[in-house]
Amino acid sequence: MHRFLQPVRERLRSALARYFGSRIMSSTQWTPNMYPSARRSDHIDTYRSETRGEVKVPDPYHWLEEYSEETDKWTSDQEEFTRTYLDSNPDRKKLEDAFRKSMDYPKFSAPFLNDDKRWYWFYNTGLQAQTVICRSKDETLPDFSESDYVGETFFDPNLLSSDGTASLSMYDFSHCGKYFAYGISLSGSDFSTIYVRSTSSPLAPGNNSIRNDDGRLPDELRYVKFSSISWTKDSKGFFYQRYPGTGTVNGQNGIQTQGDRDAMIYYHRIGTSQSDDILVHEDQEHPDWVFGAEVTEDGKYVALYTMKDTSRKNLLWIADLGQNEVGRNMKWNKICNVFDSEYDLIGNDGSLLYIRTNKAAPQYKIVTLDIEKPELGFKEFIPEDPKAYLSQVKIFNKDRLALVYKRNVIGELYVYNNTGSRLMRLARDFVGSMTVTARETEPWFFATLTGFNTPGIVCRYNIQRPEEQRWSVYRTAKVKGLNPNDFEARQVWYDSYDGTKIPMFIVRHKNTQFNGTAPAIQYGYGGFNISINPFFSPTILTFLQKYGAILAVPNIRGGGEFGETWHDAGIREKRANVYDDFIAATQFLVKNKYAAGGKVAINGGSNGGLLVAACVNRAREGTFGAAIAEVGVLDLLKFPKFTIGKAWISDYGDPEDPRDFDYIYTHSPLHNIPKNMVLPPTMLLTADHDDRVVPMHSFKYAAMLQYTLPHNRHPLLLRVDKKAGHGGGKSTEKRLQEAADKWGFAAQSMGLAWKDRQANL
């Protein structure tokens, strides 16, 4: 990293800014107390507290929990109000154009070999609404050295809607290679409908249209949610999960908010009606549990997973498909029948199962079990590395394994043999994230490498080639609108309030100085054992370039960066650690001159939206320059009552439990808005079809913010996206407009200066 000169003097800044093409912009003029009004009711909820007994909690915006004409009018007024503010940004259109240019480059996945002996891959020319599936014309591995587009289009979801709101949510090819089963979600809903088509009938331009899809078979499976598709070896049908149909007709998908109950695993036979599907598993005594069924690659076994919540703990049952007729009377080998750990079946060699688990191994290990000799129990195959998190395992060549570890949040890729011995490390010099795709019987695997300044490199390892040629770069993404090499990332460590060391990535354009003047985007999550790994974002890099800003990504507790121990340190009564870690990150950035005081815009989505709102409520006035909370969980007393919310109790606690209520109530964003403090410019983003974190969280919090602090000298806004959900399946145009709005909001509310080019002062 370069050393930089001391900051230029204050009296020279304006002149230098003009000389280098920058334009100083003051924050957009804001007139308080002009918000659309929201009716306040006298609704009160009663809870039990371990320390206070009965507690009555007013909920004046209870009516915003349900869709109604009144709710729709209020949200429309809010959206119009917010739109007026955002459109007053003189840089808004220029920022959108810059984002569009930086996003317009070919994006692709690693190829995968299907049983029809063709190669398939995901591909987007740049600004297509939805990514398409392409395939080779024969069994030859595609050569992209001359062109980004080779082969033919196999499945183009853009043909399913005129506005890009129909998206592919799941898929699987039959073992015979003749059928393609796929789920389609509308407007970002978690609900999908599964269809089936012949692989000889592509959904491609020229063959089909939005109104005409003749290549699809008559099979139509509705009410599918949180499901995968897994074919049996005979290719006669597949397993999937669905919910009862009551109240979830297509027109209501994404609008209904009732809790998800009574999930069921079914088996569907091709060419039959959904009403004839075979019920395989349900649990009427535990209606909130969810399931997954996956057939092993050799087709011998089906694995049944049971999850009662979002904790990394599940049941694992195995059935031999050769000895069982598919149905409710299948004989299951309940190899893991208590919720004590996570058990993930990697693959099998005959009756020998390979399982990734965190049983007595917070960073995960691999064990084996001979299902024909279960009395022998689990045998350790690859032990836990206490300093590296085992994130992914793939079997290839029948006798080799590709393992991805994360050491201090940086990916490491290794090859092991079938005795559990490490053979080699690949891509040793790469710093970033890694994912692997493979087939158990093939002699190769593909690894996709990404990072803060790496848009995507697909590499191939082929054991049949000479040793020095086994590892090679197969395909590299090339960005047109900006140069990723102009940016650099570093990792630093800082102390949280309790002395815990927290890692944080800092990204900048190479011409941006660490002299205490740079604005910053600080992104975080901190929950559900989910790691925030190095990622590539052309819009964020463009923002960094145009505004001389930095990106900071602290890997706070509650996530999965260091295994279950790290996750456990940020859940339930320890949630305060998550917020403390995030606030401490901002203070570290300012103290060490990575960022300017009062110019750090914090951002997060879903659980990260909760993080942002909670930190705004808790931090000292002036800590943050702006706050952008996306689809956040903001009413922590009500979250279990809606859709899949009950599953989050494992992280947040149960508000109906008197002990849990006491700590939940102290940090629920809706119930802890400070009355005597100036809050930073704040924008909440939600979507009308979000049936994961229902929009009532953002609706109620926005109404309460605006009522409690009507004279706040900074805006407190709500942005509502129409025909969109929690984020999955969102079209490229919607993502682009959202990025322009949220980062434009950060720039206009903090008064940032647009830089037409960077000056290396």
Curated annotation (Swiss-Prot):
* Keyword DNA damage part of the UniProt annotation: no
The record, for PROSITE patterns, names:
PRO_ENDOPEP_SER
Q: State the EC number(s).
A: 3.4.21.26
Active site, UniProt feature: 606, 690, 726
Q: Which reaction does it catalyse?
A: Hydrolysis of Pro-|-Xaa >> Ala-|-Xaa in oligopeptides
Q: Which GO terms describe its molecular function?
A: oligopeptidase activity; serine-type endopeptidase activity
Q: Which UniProt keywords apply?
A: Hydrolase, Protease, Serine protease
Q: Name one GO cellular component term.
A: cytosol
Does Ligase count among this protein's keywords?
no
What are the BP-aspect GO terms?
A: proteolysis
Q: Which domain of life is it from?
A: Eukaryota
Q: How does it assemble?
A: Monomer.
Recorded family membership = Belongs to the peptidase S9A family.
What the protein does?
Housekeeping prolyl oligopeptidase (POP) that behaves like a conventional POP by cleaving peptide bonds on the C-terminal side of prolyl residues within peptides that are up to approximately 30 amino acids long.
What protein is this chain from?
Prolyl oligopeptidase A
Encoding gene, per UniProt annotation: POPA
